[in-house]
A protein has these predicted regions:
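Nucleic-acid enzyme cleavage-core boundary/entry regions
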Residues: 1-117, 127, 134-137, 141-145, ...
Length: 210
């Protein structure tokens, strides 16, 4: 805030800059914005064509470079927790993306993702069902995994309190969640509950993932 005030003072002749509402400090002063990175792993060694004469399993790319890829896979798993990302089981013709950001809109408009099976796994709570709905706006084929009442009930000892989403937000989700997902969302939101995905053990993941 102090730097912002100083820059406004220095640039007082350019008063029109400050008459707009800017999303970020960088946009306001035409500064370079820190790029968004996508981190992903190959779940099938046959997909890894190699980089600099060696095969690299865990890769991070800026979003624009990721958009230009053409990985010959059939399935993509999107996961929020890093440990689960690192320990996710090997699956034929698949990659897994670690997406720790709340804003999943940064993953939209990636042409090669549009033709693939996409599986979404986040915490079982109202917020992440909202993000699932948003993901389906961009990729309607997206399916949720390990975000069902069976998983929730199996790990009931790890259920904790959580914040709710508003009625207005609820109305915007009906077109993007199936009946079971929406029913679980209503239950979670009514009771202010959540189950974090890091509480789900690796053996259970291996048995139930695609």
């Amino acid at each position: 805030k102090i730097i912002d005030e100083l820059l406004q003072f220095v640039n007082e002749r350019q008063w029109w800059i400050f008459s707009f509402e800017w999303n970020t400090f960088e946009e306001k002063y035409w500064l370079k914005i820190k790029p968004c990175f996508v981190r992903f792993r190959y779940l099938d060694n046959n997909l890894n064509s190699g980089f600099l004469w060696t095969k690299i399993d865990d890769i991070s790319l800026i979003i624009d470079d990721f958009k230009n890829l053409d990985i010959k896979c059939n399935k993509v798993f999107i996961i929020e927790n890093e440990i689960n990302y690192l320990t996710f089981p090997k699956i034929k013709d698949s990659i897994v993306i670690w997406w720790k950001w709340f804003n999943i809109s940064n993953l939209k408009n990636i042409d090669w993702l549009k033709k693939l099976e996409i599986y979404y796994w986040w915490d079982i709570d109202s917020h992440w069902f909202k993000i699932l709905a948003q993901c389906r706006k961009y990729y309607s084929q997206t399916k949720s995994i390990l975000m069902d009442m069976e998983t929730y009930s199996y790990y009931k000892q790890y259920i904790v309190k959580w914040k709710i989403i508003t009625d207005r937000e609820f109305k915007n989700l009906t077109d993007y969640l199936d009946k079971k997902e929406y029913s679980l969302l209503e239950y979670l939101n009514k009771n202010n509950l959540r189950l974090e995905q890091e509480n789900i053990d690796h053996e259970y993941v291996g048995k139930t993932s695609i």
